[in-house]
Amino acid sequence: MEIFVTGIGTDVGKTVAAAVITEALQADYWKPIQSGDFDFGDADRVKSYISNSKTVFHDNVYKFHTPASPHFAAEQENITIDITQIKRPKTKNSLVIEGAGGILVPLNEQHLVVDLIAPTDLVVVVSRHYLGSINHTLL
């Protein structure tokens, strides 16, 4: 089983949701693209919440110093994100995949985060609880 965790934006709680799912399923965790927080990224945060010994943390494919959307962070570092290089890790375990930013965040001039979601993925969309959040989530 592969679960893709995305959200309605940055800092909405994707990492906490991914950690809860990872721990509950004793699944592997993978964040293919990390922007900013180079010293203590999302994988490090998830590790701090995990107590099981079964979870494997797979390396980021792209990791940027600039705390921004992947396409902008890549541009600042003179890198082009090539989604053909973003290959899912091989594992017999369930895999929790955490997206970067929201579902329609650009990765490059042609691709968005949604393009990383496989047709067979279970998708979790993390939102917030406030007046108007249903509309923001459905947009």
Which residues make up each language-model segment?
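Switch II (G3) loop of P-loop NTPases
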Residues: 85-108
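Hydrophobic anchor at the beta1->P-loop junction of P-loop NTPases
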Residues: 5-6
